[in-house]
């Protein structure tokens, strides 16, 4: 059982409804922080390749940002995107050879009759339009809440996806279900021969609503996960392990189940989402926590490095800069003027 470090953070929060009357824009709260783009519509994922950003918007668009110019590109999918509650066009990652292939991977929600599912597909960019090309994995459980939805390509060149429990907690322990899992596949959608469960996409299980993934340079994998009202988690992920939900959460322990490296505890909520890492520290977007959080893997300490901008959905680190997106227009935030925004700050400003 891994060491549990319970983090006591005196953060008070509330869930505010989205207002049509946006508040006036406030001064940026951190020295060196700059706005790269604004007026984004519920952005979900950040991808940066050289000097160009690609962001997903939950409504079904991909936003290209280059040299200060913002272009909202259409996405043609085989199924209509469902945007109810937490659903939509969620995870997005560019293929390693994107500069030659114009290929990317996406995770989105759709309705099939009276049912709703998530699926993972490839998209190809042609004439400024993204078109669904191949269906890699379908019928990932979906509900009103807990979609998971993050996509990342690991250092092993496999595609990883987080899948929530779709508010059906029991499926997280069911290895025949894709819900409540971290999934792993080859880039063509096939099941890797070295996955921990033969013939299965399941890489780890017992997750409630995982929304972030990152790998250190040595290949160590971490994931962020929403707890049940509190007890949010940062987990060290290993193939085939059971992370406990719904049997245990937070600092609870049980034989055969892995407890988190960090937890928000019983009285605090982060609602952690996208994450990245730099020099032995994890940087995590926090929705209810309304912050970018830093977790020091050596000392076990944590702190808020960015606050005052509302809900934060995703982060990405490139060339010693931290990029992150706010998520105040998602119906649970308190939008300021010109929200939502893509921000940049040098990591040296956060020391």
What is each model feature region?
Residues 12:
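Conserved catalytic/binding loops enriched for acidic/polar residues
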Residues 20-163, 220-223, 270-302, 320-333, ...:
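Acidic, Gly/Ser/Thr-rich repeat motifs that build Ca2+-stabilized beta-propeller blades
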Residues 2-8:
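Sec-dependent signal peptide recognition
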Residues 1-2, 20-21, 210:
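Generic cytosolic/nucleocytoplasmic N-terminal low-complexity/intrinsically disordered segments
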Residues 149-150, 313-315:
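Short, surface-exposed beta-strand/loop micro-motifs that present aromatic residues
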Residues 15-17:
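C-terminal motif of bacterial Sec signal peptides marking the signal peptidase cleavage site
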Residues 82, 87-89, 97-99, 166-304, ...:
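Beta-propeller domain segments
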């Amino acid at each position: 059982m891994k060491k549990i470090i319970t983090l006591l953070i005196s953060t008070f929060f509330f869930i505010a409804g989205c207002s049509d009357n946006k508040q006036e824009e406030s001064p940026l709260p951190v020295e060196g922080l700059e706005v790269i783009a604004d007026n984004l519509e519920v952005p979900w994922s950040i991808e940066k390749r050289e000097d160009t950003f690609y962001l997903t918007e939950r409504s079904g668009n991909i936003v290209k940002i280059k040299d200060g110019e913002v272009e909202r590109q259409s996405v043609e999918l085989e199924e209509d995107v469902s945007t109810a509650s937490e659903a939509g066009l969620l995870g997005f990652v560019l293929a390693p050879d994107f500069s030659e292939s114009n290929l990317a991977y996406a995770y989105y929600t759709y309705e099939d009759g009276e049912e709703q599912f998530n699926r993972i597909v490839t998209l190809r960019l042609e004439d400024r339009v993204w078109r669904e090309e191949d269906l890699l994995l379908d019928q990932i459980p979906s509900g009103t809440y807990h979609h998971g939805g993050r996509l990342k390509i690991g250092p092993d060149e496999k595609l990883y996806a987080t899948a929530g429990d779709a508010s059906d907690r029991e499926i997280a322990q069911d290895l025949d279900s894709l819900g409540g899992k971290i999934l792993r596949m080859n880039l063509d959608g096939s099941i890797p021969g070295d996955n921990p469960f033969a013939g299965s996409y399941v890489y780890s299980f017992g997750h409630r609503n995982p929304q972030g993934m990152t790998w250190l340079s040595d290949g160590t994998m971490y994931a962020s996960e929403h707890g049940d009202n509190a007890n949010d988690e940062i987990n060290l992920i290993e193939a085939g392990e059971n992370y406990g939900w719904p049997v245990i959460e937070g600092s609870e322990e049980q034989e055969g189940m892995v407890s988190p490296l960090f937890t928000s505890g019983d009285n605090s909520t982060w609602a952690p989402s996208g994450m990245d890492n730099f020099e032995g520290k994890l940087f995590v977007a926090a929705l209810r926590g309304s912050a970018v959080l830093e977790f020091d893997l050596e000392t076990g300490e944590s702190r808020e490095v960015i606050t005052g901008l509302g809900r934060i959905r995703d982060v990405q680190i490139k060339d010693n800069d931290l990029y992150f997106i706010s998520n105040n227009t998602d119906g649970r935030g308190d939008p300021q003027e010109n929200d939502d925004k893509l921000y940049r700050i040098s990591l040296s400003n956060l020391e």
